[in-house]
Amino acid sequence: MNTTPAQNQTPAQNQNPTPAQTPAAPRGGRAPQRSASSPEGGGVGALTGLGRALRSETLKILTVRSTIVYLILAAGAMFGPMVLGSLLSGGDIESFTLSDLLIGTGIAQVIVVAFGAAGAAGETRSGMVAQAFLTEKSRSLWLIARIIVSAVAAAVMYLIGVALGWAVVQLVGPGLSADGVRPLVGGVIGIMAFAGIGAGIGALLRNTVAAVAVPVCWLFVLESMILMASSAYEMFRPVAEILPGVRVGELSGSGTGMVTEYSPVVDALIVIAWLVVICGLGLWRNRRADTK
């Protein structure tokens, strides 16, 4: 009986390859959960994601040409009046005060609210925000970062304008006499708040023209009309007391005198409440609405 000789096989050839072993899942079929202390989960992960979003929004603002335009406008609104005042004073003014130096704050507020609104609305309308939706863990991260970066950028623009105005007064004008830092502190808080409010309105309306027009009309037209109506009709008085533009003016010490004077802390809390409400509406719209 013929038999076929057995093939020579090495031990390695006789053994079948086994797949790589993976850790068994716990009983119940649930995968192991990440620890909240790991870099990718919990509060640390959220802070890391917000940090990346802040860096991204900062790069966007620094690399678009419109930022330079808004910087020139906001800074010009601050030092422009000082240039004219210094050149036209003719030696009749002994010195300017800090309140005189900040006379252009109202115009700067309108410019930065347009800056914040146009930036947030433009991101959504152009579809750029879709990249943030795909790369970030939460839809809200990009908008929170945009609000923070817009507020900080607006404060920088404002302070640059103040510094240029101070330089003009010191070099060309009669000099500057200090009358307290309240106008400057109130101006910075108002500038940052209005830039953040503008970003919230931009995310809420998602239309660049409407997002810029609504807050500008509110500050220039509606608030003045409500103030005038409150002096004649008592029913408008409660509304006039909490207007954001009015409270920012009271906070910086340049109020109209047509509303109740609260402490600076109360004025700041009212302005912050407006910021939280409007940005909250913007965050809600950002989470619920899709982008094209």
Predicted regions and their residues:
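Helix-loop-helix units of permease transmembrane domains in multi-pass membrane transporters
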Residues: 118-152
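Alpha-helical transmembrane segments of multi-pass membrane transporters/translocases
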Residues: 2-37, 47, 51, 250-292
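Generic structural signal for small/hydrophobic residues in well-ordered secondary structure
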Residues: 57, 136-138, 207
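Extracellular/periplasmic helix-loop junction at the C-terminal end of a transmembrane helix
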Residues: 225-244
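A short amphipathic helical element positioned immediately N-terminal to and/or at the very start
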Residues: 50-62
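Transmembrane alpha-helical segments in integral membrane proteins
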Residues: 115, 119, 123, 129, ...
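Helix-capping/transition residues at the boundaries of transmembrane alpha-helices
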Residues: 60, 121, 132-134, 198, ...
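Secretory targeting signals
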Residues: 30-34, 40-47, 65-117, 143-206, ...
